[in-house]
């Protein structure tokens, strides 16, 4: 049975839990999606989602709750991890605009700009092209970070807004600028969870 954990310290956790449950159903896979708060919940975990929210807060709480090092280790060992918005920042190797005390998992060879799109008023929705699906995907961007550079050959673009890369994959790791959990479309979650089944 698949066990998916959504890091539930801050951010849009419930939306990811619902999206992951629907995605597993659509894939015909039996599994459980849990609200991940403590390191002991990582036992037998199949995949992890790091939601949007505020990256400084998520970073601090992951360290405080003892999740930071075990999640980093699992990612390095090949466990599928997907980060959206602030989750992408948490996964990135280099972050422009980070605060000095912020720690990052550094599992994804990308450079991101932390608040590239500005304040809440600059949030928008636009169709995204996906590498793994012919139909456009409804991309919801909320004070999104921006992927400014791919730092290694291992990073593959999987989502585009026009000609700009807004989603990437590196082996077991997926990082997205946008919020797939805020739509009724589960294609991105299904693509990610196929790595775990």
Curated annotation (Swiss-Prot):
L-glutamine binds at residues 53-55, 114, 142-143. One of its GO terms (biological process) is pyridoxine metabolic process. Pathway: Cofactor biosynthesis; pyridoxal 5'-phosphate biosynthesis. It catalyses: aldehydo-D-ribose 5-phosphate + D-glyceraldehyde 3-phosphate + L-glutamine = pyridoxal 5'-phosphate + L-glutamate + phosphate + 3 H2O + H(+); L-glutamine + H2O = L-glutamate + NH4(+). The keyword Lipid biosynthesis does not apply. The active site is at residues 85, 179, 181. GO terms for molecular function: glutaminase activity; pyridoxal 5'-phosphate synthase (glutamine hydrolysing) activity. Keywords: Glutamine amidotransferase, Hydrolase, Lyase, Pyridoxal phosphate. GO terms for cellular component: cytosol; glutaminase complex. The keyword Lyase applies. Belongs to the glutaminase PdxT/SNO family. In the presence of PdxS, forms a dodecamer of heterodimers. Only shows activity in the heterodimer. PANTHER family: PYRIDOXAL 5'-PHOSPHATE SYNTHASE SUBUNIT SNO (PTHR31559), PYRIDOXAL 5'-PHOSPHATE SYNTHASE SUBUNIT SNO1-RELATED (PTHR31559:SF0). HAMAP family: PdxT. This is Pyridoxal 5'-phosphate synthase subunit PdxT. It comes from Thermococcus kodakarensis (strain ATCC BAA-918 / JCM 12380 / KOD1) (Pyrococcus kodakaraensis (strain KOD1)).
């Amino acid at each position: 049975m698949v066990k998916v954990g959504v890091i539930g310290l801050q951010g849009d956790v419930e939306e990811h839990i619902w999206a992951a449950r629907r995605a597993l159903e659509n894939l015909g896979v039996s599994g459980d999606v849990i609200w991940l708060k403590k390191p002991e919940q990582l036992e037998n975990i199949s995949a992890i989602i790091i939601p949007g929210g505020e990256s400084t807060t998520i970073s601090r709480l992951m360290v405080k709750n003892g999740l930071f090092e075990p999640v980093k280790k699992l990612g390095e060992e090949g466990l599928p991890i997907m980060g959206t918005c602030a989750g992408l920042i948490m996964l990135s190797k280099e972050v422009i605009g980070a605060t000095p005390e912020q720690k990052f998992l550094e599992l994804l060879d990308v450079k991101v700009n932390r608040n590239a799109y500005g304040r809440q008023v600059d949030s928008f929705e636009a169709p995204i092209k996906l590498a793994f699906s012919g139909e456009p995907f409804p991309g919801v961007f909320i004070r999104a970070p921006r992927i400014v550079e791919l730092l290694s050959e291992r990073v593959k673009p999987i989502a585009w807004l026009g000609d700009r890369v807004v989603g990437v994959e590196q082996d077991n790791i997926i990082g997205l600028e946008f919020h797939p959990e805020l739509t009724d479309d589960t294609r991105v979650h299904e693509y990610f969870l196929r790595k775990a089944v």
